[in-house]
Amino acid sequence: DDFFNEYREHYADLVEYISGKRFVKKGGKFVEEKTKTAASEFANAFNGDDKAVRDFVKKMMGRLVFLQFLQKKGWLGVPKNAKWGTGDKNFIYNLFNNADDSVKNDFLEQALEPLFFNSLNCNRGQESIAPKAICSIYGSEIRIPYLNGGLFEEDELDKKRVKFKKEHFESIFEFFNQYNFTIDETDTDDVEIGVDPEMLGKIFENLLEDNKDKGAFYTPKEIVQYMCRESLIAYLETETLKPDETASKDKIKNFVLNHEALSFSEKEKADILKALIDVKICDPAVGSGAFPMGMLNELLPCVQILTGEAKTRVELKKHIVKNNIYGVDIEKGAVDIARLRFWLAIIVDEEEPLPLPNLDYKIMQGNSLLESFEGEDLSNMTKQESGNLFDNGETIAKLTQAINGFYIPHDHVAKAKIRAQIKENIIQLLKERQLPPKVIEDLSKLDLHENSQFFLWHTWFYDVFNRPNDCNGRNGFDIVIGNPPYKIISKDDSKKSIYDKNFIVAHGGKRNLYHLFFEQGINLLHDNSILSYITPDTYFSGNDTESLREFFVKNCEIKSIVHYTEKDKVFENVTQAVAVCIMKKNISKNCIFHIFEKDSYNQISYSALNKENKFIFKSANIIITKMKKCKNTFDDICEAYKGDVNLGLKKNFFTNKKSKNTLPLIRGVQISKYIWSPGSEYCSLTALSKNHTDKERIVFQEVANMGLKQRTKGTILKNIIAGDSCNVLFSTNENFPNKYILAILNSKAINYYFKYFNQTNHVPIGEVRKFPIPSATPAQQQEIIVLVDKILAAKKDCRVKHENDSELADTSTLEMQIDALVYKLYGLTDEEIKIIEQT
């Protein structure tokens, strides 16, 4: 943590120096604020684009971290005529110290950029002598390797002129010198105090102050390893076993977990090796590369044990990276770090520095959810057509040959030519597809292989969707794995209408990006292949995720779900219940799966999941079953809706002045059990689309954190306007008075019922409408209503006397009496009541 925190501070210092702005934490959230005067001569180079400033600093610091690893290999500052590995293991720090002050005050341009662009990215022949600028500063002729790969390729951002002070680099290099940089990140049990590439990924994902707003969270290494292993086991079972070979399943599990292959026959070994060589794995929200790296670390020993000494570790790694692993992310910075980790994974096993492979068409930037542009479908662009006006086979062949060839190391001039050829071929394919000229023109202006608007799955990963015949027509990925973003899609999201059109699960309540990633992940797979995601657990139940559950039941066979509650705190500094779901793309009506918790599990049968029970991933216990036997639900006896006004859209109608045309505005935070706290806001009556304000209505919280003991809580109000952070209901059946309904809503029984199914921080009105409400005789109702009246009177009296401090009114005894009567109405036994009381 010390390393992460100090790294963040150095990063923030450099950003602040250029832009005058810094992210500061306010209310648990990072907010960008103006903190000092910007260095205007440099800030102007970015034209006020603060994100570009952050990206510039992020990339520069990423390169500096990479150099820390390189110098530990002894590959930097190698004396002329000396062997690789004999270099200066503190090269960067010494290069800086040897420079005079004029160079130190312009160290980026005078030293680092020649090192990046004219050394590490430039083939200077066998001797690899560093440019004069570097040798002059260092004080002797030295060797610097040519690494290729792309990390040190100059881009448009690099052309910005920035001059940091010597104090900036002095501080950064002294900070780096405090830590041991070690390249190997394969061992999850490694406790050495140092910085490895896995930590580099963690740094990056924690560095993005807006990552949490984007719904991106860093996945712990242990969970990554579990998901990679379980996915690989499920894949090998599917590819190499018949359905009834139970004993062989144990052998495969032992092979993946312990790399034990002695129990396999030669044929079994050959089948497994072929499956491992052929496997295609993708993370569609790759982040800093945790899951692809995890898969590399799992595949490598499995292939090694089956091939013996036939290939070296580095040869196997290069084969796996080239043939088995793919990734996409909407953030360019994430893609840069993910590629960097793969290069480091290769370097760790290299005796001497060799040009690194190009990962431009392996780990790529793009919007994984869209393969269209301006309403035009681009997914069929590389579908071979013949006999039409145009035969596109030749163009496709040229394109795929160029993409595949790009992986091989080239100098930057050759790479630029190949990129131009690839784009030219794509534009030609678009013309052959007869797309509108305007669309083709707009596409030609974009960087097609690095943009945040769409991703050409079937073009860039043509080899995945057009596999050779010996792969049995498996067109698509074998494993899709990852931690997709968790973010509600807002009404003003520019892509919302496209998502609504393209995704089945984008309907019914609030849409979350992770819902769409589930559907897209399944779409990217071929039949009988494996998807493994870690996401919020909110899809277990709730109206907002009913369409997602239905999609699962109709398209997938869930293998298992491992559930982590909020208390498990899977993600640092985030309270979020999550679940690891492993499923197979396969329609199965007889599937049974388990939801595993820390001390228990819940068995779910597909046959029990249907439209009637909203496909809820929870088997009803005896208490729920009894409560469901009630003849009526809230929907049958009352009108219920979410607030009177939208707090965001109607804020122009809010005021602090009371008038005859306004009523008090109530927000959810003002509501508690049987009481409300008056505020100072009023809302104009003209904001209402329907006016029920003259009625006595039950008003209760719409936002209620999952961790709260009591999540259903409300009171009765009249002549108020409720914001949409409240829910509102009132009786439409004289046999069910408002005060009786309020007692049921505030009861422990209905709170237990709601919490059993709901895994969100909201109280969706659609779920409230389905609450079962017990019938009661007039006498039974009256007994409860009398108690409600006493509570309301006590709360009201207390508020008057104690200036809104409702906690001084202890009505717990009266509330316990109501709970006892409600339990009786639901027909619950003493043992069942005990379960609710202890929950």
Describe the predicted segments one by one.
Residues 41, 45, 186-191, 213-561, ...:
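SAM-dependent methyltransferase catalytic region
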